[in-house]
Structure formats: structure tokens, C-alpha cells
């Protein structure tokens, strides 16, 4: 197979189907966060973005709007098992792996939480690929043509979720 044929095969594979799901928010998981009887925010589960798991450091950005209002990154954290960090700090945690069956929560600090009823969540997750394919020998092909490294995958979802009790 020539170099050009390998490039064409990789471009064809990358251009078809994506590894990341657009079913990001786990249905039925939206709930208020309550501490000592006070609503301090809300949280929801994120579905795993890949059938094989995800390195947290590959999450380049998580954007969230709730009922049309953008949520500030400073108010948003990600929790995976006993690991908790601000969403802006995921790239610094290269040793944290989100296995396929692990629960992952997005936690938002908001005094009063959310009212009972339906809420529209719009989430966008930008994920850098954690591995790639070379169409050349050794490192040939990675520098200028490693499409999967240079073009992160973006998953988007708009979903209506319900909180039964405020």
C-alpha cells in the first residue's frame, strides 16, 4: 500500500462514524445537590464517551447551558469515583481513567439549585483523541497529517430533564 493509499484509508475511516457518543447526559440523573437541607447546586451523570473508556486529560472542554443560561466553568466540577476537579483542570490529570462502567458526575454550584419541573440542558464536550494512526513509517505522517490529533471530536446534546422535587 502506498503512502497516498494509507492516507486515503485513514481519512475514509476518520470521516465515517465517530467514537464519541452524542448521548452525553444520563437520562433521569438530574438532581439537586443538598447539603444540610440547603440546595447548593445540581448534578447529573455523564454517559461514558467511548465504549472503551476515556482518559480525563483528553477532555478539552465541557460547555453547559441550563434553560438557556450558560454555566461558568468556575462553577462546574467533574467527579469520577473519589476524584473531583474543576472542569478546567481535567487536562492536568493524566493519570485518571474513566473506565467504561464508572459513574461520572457533572456538579454545578448554584445557590438554590434548580426548581422542580423540566429543565433544558445543552452540553457540548470537546475530546482530544488519546491515540492515533500513522500512515507512514516510525513518526512519518504524524506531524502534518495526524487528523485525529489535530481535530478533536465534539459531542453535543440538547435534552429536557426533570427534577421531581426542588
Predicted regions and their residues:
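Terminal leader/tail segments of proteins
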Residues: 2-166
Amino acid at each position: 500500500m502506498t503512502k497516498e493509499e494509507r492516507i486515503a484509508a485513514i481519512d475514509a475511516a476518520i470521516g465515517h462514524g465517530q467514537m464519541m457518543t452524542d448521548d452525553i447526559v444520563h437520562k433521569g440523573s438530574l438532581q439537586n445537590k443538598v447539603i444540610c437541607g440547603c440546595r447548593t447546586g445540581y448534578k447529573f451523570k455523564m454517559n461514558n464517551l467511548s465504549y472503551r473508556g476515556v482518559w480525563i486529560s483528553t477532555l478539552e472542554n465541557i460547555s453547559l447551558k441550563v434553560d438557556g443560561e450558560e454555566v461558568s466553568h468556575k462553577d462546574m466540577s467533574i467527579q469520577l469515583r473519589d476524584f473531583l476537579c474543576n472542569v478546567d483542570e481535567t487536562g492536568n490529570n493524566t493519570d485518571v481513567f474513566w473506565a467504561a462502567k464508572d459513574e461520572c458526575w457533572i456538579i454545578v454550584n448554584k445557590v438554590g439549585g434548580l426548581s422542580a419541573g423540566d429543565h433544558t440542558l445543552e452540553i457540548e464536550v470537546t475530546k482530544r483523541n488519546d491515540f492515533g494512526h500513522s500512515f507512514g513509517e516510525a513518526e512519518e505522517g504524524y506531524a502534518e497529517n495526524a487528523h485525529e490529533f489535530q481535530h478533536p471530536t465534539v459531542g453535543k446534546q440538547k435534552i429536557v430533564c426533570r427534577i421531581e422535587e426542588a
